[in-house]
């Protein structure tokens, strides 16, 4: 099979992926690489939203999961990477509602059943987008087992869990405070609320004492407490004013009452340690129905909450008549105006505050007192904590266990109901007296109700409820399946730190409760992919990258259109276009999936934030080209020739052969350790350095010398080493760069006496310590140092690459004689003269261990001195420019960090060059 002259990722990626999937290579057991008796290895894909498209975070984590999957599959494990998607209740419902809006259709007019039919229709048409994109990245999931959280089997598991928890007394319905999105009109989880600092106001309002304590003569303001608030509209629901019990200013007033402005109510002055005496006036309004902290204070002081908002964010009929029906922000404006009119608004100050907004609607989220379904968490949390404390579940890096523990030690009951139509409908029914009957289906509920007429609860379950069951529901639970026995606990969960509580902890608790097993043995927490400057990637910032654009490339106009369409604030389009044109004047070139995967792996350290630099993609695309060209060289020199495959033929391994074979063993050891430690960056670095720095840059050059030696045995051994080391290196790199390694392996494998249909079914390389030859490794280290020294001498003497000159060398004669062919070829020498001592001359001398080296050339000392002096002056001028720039605080403070760092690197480079120039001048006697 002849290789193309250049590496074309697009040509090979689709061809190989369709073959891998079509042949069933991604499946565990006999259909894959390992039998049922092999050790089980399983990874659960965190199910992306069915509405979603592949973003950089997905692509990053999927690369790591696929690398682990391919690695363990090649190691002979019975390997399953379980894929699937999440129904994403809120996100999906919004997408379909927006489509209906474009047709001027309201879902409420359509009705629940018809709307759900539309959602399912959309899911079938568009729901597989992210799965197709994962395939482009090379994900070797078992797609035959792909699951969806609303599938029949998974839905049955959800119902079973709800019913069991309810009957165990762990699920209840109650009125509590929740995050409420008034646009969606549903409760939302903390993860669906994004808080950001915004400019606002702090209003200081006078709450008059109920009984005049100091008089109100001559039209003066009544006496009272001045309360500071950022939300005057909620004062209509105030039930108390709180002060700190140790605040001397107000201690004598505790137990008294104030009149609630604009309302005909009296509320108490209470003492609570929660109050910060330094904030505002030290007096805080307490609105238990519309603030989470106030709710807790209200519970402590037995205050009855008074909700004053409707579900769509308007003032309800429990407030004074003049505010009823007003939108909450219109009510705020009217309340402030009325307070001012009644001389009760003391002052208004600008104030920065954290404003919580729904991540889907951008609407300000309201704490709202509503009836919801809850899971009692304390007992479940205890078992979850024990699992980590005992080591049954291990976090990597270890510090994330602390975050997990903090969440579970301070856990609250879990609100699991959502006021949506799309999702798992809560399996609870009500009779006319509002009695609740929880059952697996309507028929069972009617039996429990004695045949009475029942109506099912309208709410659906929080998406995280079904996601919490993912590790065991996808394996067939509640049925007792072979997959459940084989693959649970799964091996590792690869996920982000932002969902340690929302997903990771809940999976641990649910799996322990229902299966008696932990869901996974290890949790590898990845960092967050950010842009090159360290900023979070977001549509509004205009710095989002599409992984497929990095694979296929994208023209500048198309990139601008993609970045500026669908903005929440269209006014940002101009600045985003400007930034994009500056960053990508030629658009984004095609790097291919392998280069992108290798980039992600190289970035996968144990840090919290990961800066994505596209220059790395370019570097790893160059790596792929280098590997491709190395394979072409090996094929051209080995195909149709004797590569030592017959055992009886004589072989004669040189130090260079033994060195590269030994270095391969060291690389295999290091890569295996890196996978064990989840240090994908170390695995990538080791593979890169071995292939590029040692095999390509050094061994191929040594091999050229050996192939030109005229010695048939040396040539045969060299070809054998070339082919076998390359074939092994391809297997070593395959989990990270699967496409190019498969394409090359098909051609290289026969030269190394390897047979098989695919590289992904081959055994993963394992180090053989007996192949380490310390003597050869030491000799080649010395040879490389001598070659580099000769190259440095050539540079110092300003010799052109085409100019070949003799070398005078002093040292061990046998060693120099052995090194001679390599030195002549790689250092471009015409001859090597081994001397007892070097002659006195102005030419520079290199000392390498016990060896002394000098190039035998005549030097025009005056001309060389003049050249070096001019170069020294130039470098000093450049150094001064760089020093001036770095001393300028405007430059250092305002220029991008990357630019400042580049300037520092330039200065360091000039400093090094200056030292070398001075050293050369000194050798010339200057």
From Swiss-Prot:
Localization, UniProt: Cytoplasm
Quickly give the catalysed reaction: tRNA(Val) + L-valine + ATP = L-valyl-tRNA(Val) + AMP + diphosphate
SUPFAM superfamilies from the entry?
Anticodon-binding domain of a subclass of class I aminoacyl-tRNA synthetases, Nucleotidylyl transferase, tRNA-binding arm, ValRS/IleRS/LeuRS editing domain
Q: Quick one: which residues bind ATP?
A: 539
Q: Which domain of life does the protein's organism represent? A: Bacteria
Known partners and oligomeric status: Monomer.
What PANTHER family has UniProt attached to this entry?
A: VALINE--TRNA LIGASE, CHLOROPLASTIC_MITOCHONDRIAL 2, VALYL-TRNA SYNTHETASES
Query: Can you name this protein?
Result: Valine--tRNA ligase
What is the organism of origin for this protein? Nitrosospira multiformis (strain ATCC 25196 / NCIMB 11849 / C 71)
């Amino acid at each position: 099979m002849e290789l193309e002259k250049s590496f074309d990722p697009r040509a090979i990626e689709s061809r190989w992926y369709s073959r891998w999937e079509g042949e069933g290579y991604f499946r565990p057991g006999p259909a894959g690489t390992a039998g049922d008796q092999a050790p089980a290895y399983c990874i659960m894909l965190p199910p992306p939203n069915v509405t979603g498209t592949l973003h950089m975070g997905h692509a990053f984590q999927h690369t790591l999961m696929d690398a682990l999957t391919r690695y363990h599959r090649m190691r002979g494990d019975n390997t399953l990477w379980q894929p699937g998607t999440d129904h994403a209740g809120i996100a999906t419902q919004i997408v379909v509602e927006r489509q209906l809006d474009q047709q001027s259709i309201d879902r409420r007019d359509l009705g629940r059943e018809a709307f759900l039919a539309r959602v399912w229709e959309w899911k079938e048409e568009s729901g597989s987008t992210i799965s197709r994109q994962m395939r482009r990245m090379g994900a070797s999931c078992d797609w035959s087992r792909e699951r969806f959280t609303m599938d029949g089997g998974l839905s049955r598991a959800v119902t079973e869990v709800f019913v069991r928890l309810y009957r165990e007394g762990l699920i209840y319905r109650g009125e509590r405070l929740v995050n409420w999105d008034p646009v969606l009109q549903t409760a939302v989880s903390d993860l669906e609320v994004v808080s950001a600092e915004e400019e606002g106001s702090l209003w200081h309002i006078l709450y008059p004492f109920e009984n005049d304590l100091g008089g109100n003569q001559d039209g003066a303001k009544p006496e009272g407490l001045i309360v500071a608030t950022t939300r005057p509209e909620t004062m209509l629901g105030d039930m108390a004013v709180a002060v700190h019990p140790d605040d001397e200013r107000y201690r004598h007033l505790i137990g008294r009452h104030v009149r609630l402005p604009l309302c005909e109510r009296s509320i108490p002055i209470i003492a609570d340690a929660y109050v910060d005496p330094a904030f505002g006036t030290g007096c805080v309004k307490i609105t238990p129905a519309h603030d989470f902290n106030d709710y807790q204070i209200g519970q402590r002081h037995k205050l009855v909450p008074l909700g004053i908002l409707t579900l769509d964010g308007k003032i309800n009929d429990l407030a004074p008549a003049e505010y009823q029906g007003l939108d909450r922000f219109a009510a705020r404006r009217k309340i402030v105006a009325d307070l001012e009119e009644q001389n009760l608004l003391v002052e208004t100050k600008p104030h920065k505050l954290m404003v919580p907004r729904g991540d889907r609607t951008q609407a300000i989220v309201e704490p709202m007192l509503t009836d919801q379904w809850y899971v009692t968490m304390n007992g479940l949390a205890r078992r979850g904590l024990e699992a980590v404390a005992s080591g049954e579940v291990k976090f990597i890096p270890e510090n994330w266990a602390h975050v997990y523990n903090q969440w579970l030690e301070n856990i609250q009951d879990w609100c699991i109901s959502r006021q949506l139509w799309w999702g798992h409908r809560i399996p609870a029914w009500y009779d006319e007296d509002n009695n609740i009957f929880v059952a697996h289906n309507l028929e069972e509920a009617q039996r429990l109700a004695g045949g009475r007429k029942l109506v099912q609860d309208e709410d659906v379950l929080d998406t995280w409820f079904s996601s919490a069951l993912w590790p065991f529901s996808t394996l067939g639970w509640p049925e007792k399946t072979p997959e459940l026995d084989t693959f649970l606990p799964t091996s590792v969960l690869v996920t982000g730190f932002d969902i340690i509580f929302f997903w990771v902890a809940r999976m641990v608790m649910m799996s322990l409760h229902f299966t008696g097993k932990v869901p996974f043995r290890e949790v590898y927490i990845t960092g967050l992919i950010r842009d090159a400057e360290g900023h979070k990637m977001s549509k509004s910032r205009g710095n989002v990258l599409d992984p497929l654009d990095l694979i296929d490339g994208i023209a500048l106009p198309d990139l601008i259109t993609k970045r500026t369409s669908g903005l929440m604030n269209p006014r940002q389009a101009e600045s985003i276009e400007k930034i994009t044109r500056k960053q990508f004047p030629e658009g984004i070139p095609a790097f291919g999936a392998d280069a992108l995967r290798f980039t992600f792996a190289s970035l996968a350290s144990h840090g919290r934030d990961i800066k994505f630099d596209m220059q790395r993609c370019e570097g790893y695309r160059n790596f792929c080209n280098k590997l491709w060209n190395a394979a072409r060289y090996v094929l051209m020199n080995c195909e149709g020739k004797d590569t030592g495959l017959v055992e009886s033929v004589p072989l004669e391994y040189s130090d260079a052969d033994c060195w590269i074979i030994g270095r391969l063993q060291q690389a295999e050891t290091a890569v295996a350790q890196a996978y064990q430690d989840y240090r994908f960056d170390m695995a990538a670095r080791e593979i890169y350095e071995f292939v590029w720095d040692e095999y390509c840059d050094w061994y191929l050059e040594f091999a050229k010398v050996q192939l030109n030696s005229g010695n048939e045995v040396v040539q045969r051994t060299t070809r054998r080493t070339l082919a076998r080391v390359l074939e092994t290196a391809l297997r070593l790199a395959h989990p990270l760069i699967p496409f190019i390694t498969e394409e090359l392996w098909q051609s290289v494998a026969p030269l190394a006496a390897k047979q098989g249909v695919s590289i992904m079914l081959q055994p993963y390389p394992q180090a053989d310590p007996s192949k380490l030859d310390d003597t050869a490794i030491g000799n080649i280290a010395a040879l490389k140092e001598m070659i580099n020294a000769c190259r440095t001498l050539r540079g110092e003497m300003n010799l052109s690459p085409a100019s070949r000159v003799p070398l005078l060398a002093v040292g061990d004669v046998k060693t120099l004689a052995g090194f001679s062919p390599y030195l002549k070829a790689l250092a471009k020498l015409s001859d090597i003269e081994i001397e007892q001592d070097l002659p006195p001359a102005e030419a520079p001398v290199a000392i390498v261990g016990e060896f002394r080296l000098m190039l035998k050339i005549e030097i025009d000392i005056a001309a060389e001195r003049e050249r070096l002096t001019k170069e020294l002056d130039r470098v000093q001028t450049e150094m001064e420019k760089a020093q001036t720039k770095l001393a300028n605080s405007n430059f250092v403070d305002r220029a991008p960090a990357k630019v400042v760092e580049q300037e520092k690197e330039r200065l360091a480079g000039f400093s090094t060059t200056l030292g070398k120039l001075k050293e050369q001048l000194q050798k010339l006697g200057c």
